[in-house]
Amino acid sequence: MNEHSLIEIEGLNKTFDDGYVSIRDISLNIKKGEFITILGPSGCGKTTLLRLLAGFEDPTYGKIKVNGIDIKDMAIHKRPFATVFQDYALFSHLTVYKNIAYGLKVMWTKLDEIPKLVSDYQKQLALKHLKLERKIEQLQKNNSNAQRIKKLKEKLQKLLEINKQKVIEFENKEKLRREDIYKNLEQLTKEWDLLSQKKLKEVEQQKQAIDKSFEKVENKYKKDPWFFQHSEIRLKQYQKKKTELKADIKATKNKEQIQKLTKELQTLKQKYANKKAIDKEYDKLVVAYNKKDYWTSYWETYTLQQKEAFEKRYLSRKLTKAEQNKKVSDVIEMVGLKGKEDRLPDELSGGMKQRVALARSLVVEPEILLLDEPLSALDAKVRKNLQKELQQIHKKSGLTFILVTHDQEEALVLSDRIVVMNEGNILQVGNPVDIYDSPKTEWIANFIGQANIFKGTYLGEKKIQLQSGEIIQTDVDNNYVVGKQYKILIRPEDFDLVPENKGFFNVRVIDKNYKGLLWKITTQLKDNTIVDLESVNEVDVNKTFGVLFDPIDVHLMEV
């Protein structure tokens, strides 16, 4: 385990039954207390990744480690996560208070320490003493029978001595009970460890046997060069190729050519049938291996889960009503719901409903909070307010937050680090400044904010010649290769308009749009390359300007 990582995702894959690959062998480490945002367009796999973490989906293979333990076979309710959903998922018949408190009904806490239990027991016994003392005081006030008062005082003294002995007995009994529990737990832990080690060896042997079967199947592929040449061929490609060959046969009049194409078609059918049979064997082995990998995960966490179940039964208790009330009150204060406790969800705005959903997840004290696009259904102003509150709650709680969103601005505002995803792959991981200013690819540059992408050649000494001929400079030195072509990124807001021939190069204005605070200006280089920029001042269409920019804002990307 990476000593600084709370979550370690290793080679995680999710392939659905129809063959669609949603998550493609991704790996990611998340530190304790981080605010991580998984950012990408619809269908990129970000929500699937969140569902895999929460346990709503099972991975095809790979590992999801929390505190060094693979949890992919762990039940949802045992995972250290709580989820805030986009659609709130509130109970419509319960008040705000009861919605938030709902999860506490099944929440357990450690048994109180023995001194606390003894103190509580003493308080119970003291109530009896108090009743007797009050009775004596009342009799004395009323000048009642002195003999009766004397007897009651003797009774009180005797009760004090008896209860003192009871407290000692109670404390000794509780100590012995706990000693027995801990001894039993120690013995059971040894037995669980032995069993899990035995089972892990058995599973490892079974996996090794499957590995040998993999080798046999791979040898079948190696026997025929055709399989290597067509390793990626699938049903659609096969049908397309078959249709093309049939069309060629039909269109050809030359007998020799017809025979050649017919033979090629027969070979294709035979080879594809053979490959399909071998693929089927291979796929069966993959399924078998992945099942064994789940058993590996199960037996690796077996002792821990058995120990937790034992401790819950013998060394834990449910929360008292007073404890529940305090937790709910604290979280209501934290998320800004004070005064709304008795309202029903239908009486709340969208922003308030999302606060309730957030409070309900926070109150159960998860180690990690998963947020599935919780702000996407809210209007812009409410969303921005809640973004600020989310940041404050994250700082106050110290929890690890994992947010899924397609909103680039939201990701840049909230995150410690951003994970950019597309088509099931992680493309880049970095802090918001790195992701925005130094994207690894043109796709990321265009997805996050607006981007001007130029083609150019690196000349050395931090100089670049654009395809249109202009020479510009960068402050970034990343061992770029002299003479190599790169794609150059400059953001629209990094340009400054100056009079013609006073800048690094000239542009002609071809369009303008007012955005409120700024004008979005569309311009053109002399080779017709489009350059978008922003200006606080309105400019005239068809007018030519020079442009300036800081070399540090010039970023090079691989072609």
Curated annotation (Swiss-Prot):
The keyword Transferase does not apply. It catalyses: ATP + H2O + polyamine-[polyamine-binding protein]Side 1 = ADP + phosphate + polyamineSide 2 + [polyamine-binding protein]Side 1. It is found in: Cell membrane. SUPFAM superfamilies: MOP-like, P-loop containing nucleoside triphosphate hydrolases. Residues 108-317 are annotated as: Insert. Its EC number is 7.6.2.11. Its main location: membrane. Keywords: ATP-binding, Cell membrane, Membrane, Nucleotide-binding, Translocase, Transport. ATP binds at G40, P41, S42, G43, C44, G45, K46, T47. Belongs to the ABC transporter superfamily. Spermidine/putrescine importer (TC 3.A.1.11.1) family. This is Spermidine/putrescine import ATP-binding protein PotA. It comes from Mycoplasma genitalium (strain ATCC 33530 / DSM 19775 / NCTC 10195 / G37). The lineage of its organism: Bacteria, Bacillati, Mycoplasmatota, Mycoplasmoidales, Mycoplasmoidaceae.
